[in-house]
Amino acid sequence: MNSVIDLRTYVSASNSRLLVMVDLQEKNYDELAHDRASDLRRSLENCMSAIRHARNLGLPIAFTRQTDSSESIERSAQSAWISGFEPKRSDMVFEHLQPSCYTNQLFDDIVSQIGSFAIAGLVAEQTCLATAIDASHRGHHVTFLSDASASRGRHDTDARAVHVVTTKAIELFADTVTTRDWLVATSPRTPKGHRHG
């Protein structure tokens, strides 16, 4: 393996104390599934790896979903989770009316206490980007899991190209890593194998 690891990004990723999974809703899945250029299956596999890892480590997980209405009855009908990605009772769930997760005051309060988080999920060109910008303005540290995220195609641009541009834009406000690098950075380190003396 010949990859070079950016030490600053590695250290920053290891400080993630919350995993935020955005917009893992069936309506978003259905929209992305129609765009053959989106790498939806790979993105969801990486989302599941990040979720399992966070649960194994006891890291808190926040699931967010955008809603079109403030009426709770309408929200529940519009916001079904993708099968297999339903939050557990121990997970936090935040709904937001605008693209940024920070439009939910409770989300803002909790992240303000924690200070750093990793983010991934669907509709990255909207929710992940807006949330990363708001986090940066609040002095919070974000790690974007680029391969555990997917973006929608826009106008005459396919989903893959939009996601490349989205990732570059998020890099202005957050650290961007692969899921594998985040898993390694957040895994417990043991002194096993170290020789002293």
Language model feature labels by segment:
Residues 21, 64, 145:
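Generic enzyme active-site microenvironment
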Residues 25-31:
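Short acidic, Gly/Ser-rich segments with clustered Asp/Glu that frequently serve as metal-coordination loops
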Residues 1-18, 52, 72-197:
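Active-site-adjacent betaalpha module
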Residues 28, 69-71:
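Short, active-site-adjacent cap segments at secondary-structure transitions
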Residues 18-24:
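N-terminal nucleotide-binding beta1-loop-alpha1 segment
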Residues 65-67, 122:
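Short, well-ordered beta-to-alpha junction loops that form the rim of enzyme active sites
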Residues 55, 66, 140:
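Histidine-centered active-site/metal-ligand motif
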Residues 15, 33-62:
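A short alpha/beta connector and helix-capping loop motif
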